[in-house]
Design a protein with these regions (language model features):
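C-terminal beta-sandwich interaction modules and adjacent acidic
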Residues: 1-163
């Protein structure tokens, strides 16, 4: 503040504190597990965490128990982003990692694939503000030779930035 004479009475500063979303310890494995049942298999995704900073990693396991024997062309994890602004919407695959290719999956046998999917360092965080939003989904895909038998499972994840 200044007086009419030009003498400064007080000065002020603005401080902005940015903090990542708080993740509470003690979340159960069930909180971080997603499961889908298909005629041909049961697909389960178990995450280490579903809230990650840019440049970090989404990690966990993809599990499958086959009800039929099937040939998988590709088993992969994908990170999808959806950006909405008003009536416009843009969805894209931001990251993809193949866990295994061309493998026969036998019935009644459990399969487990560990994964570590990097989150891009330069990206938008999860945000919802009026008619503008950015959201993220982690998708597990078991792409098979059987017609129309792509097994997939999705889970919303949160991405944050820090300075």
């Amino acid at each position: 503040l200044e007086m009419e004479s030009g003498n400064t009475i007080t000065t002020s500063s603005e401080i902005t504190i940015l903090a990542p979303q708080v993740v509470h310890a003690g979340r159960s494995a069930a909180d971080l597990t997603e499961e889908a049942t298909f005629t041909g298999c049961i697909l389960t995704m178990v995450l280490v965490n579903d809230v990650v900073g840019v440049g970090g990693y989404l990690e966990g396991e993809l599990r499958a128990r086959m009800n039929i024997t099937d040939q998988a062309k590709d088993i992969r994890m994908e990170l999808h982003s959806t950006e909405k602004s008003g009536d416009r919407e843009d969805e894209s695959v931001r990251q993809r990692v193949s866990l295994e290719k061309d493998v026969q999956l036998a019935s009644e046998r459990p399969y487990v694939w560990a994964f570590s999917l990097p989150v891009p360092e330069r990206t938008l965080p999860t945000v919802q503000s009026g008619r503008t939003s950015v959201s993220w989904r982690l998708k597990a895909v078991v792409d098979t030779d059987t017609a129309n038998a792509e097994y997939h499972l999705e889970r919303k994840v949160q991405i944050f930035t820090s300075t």
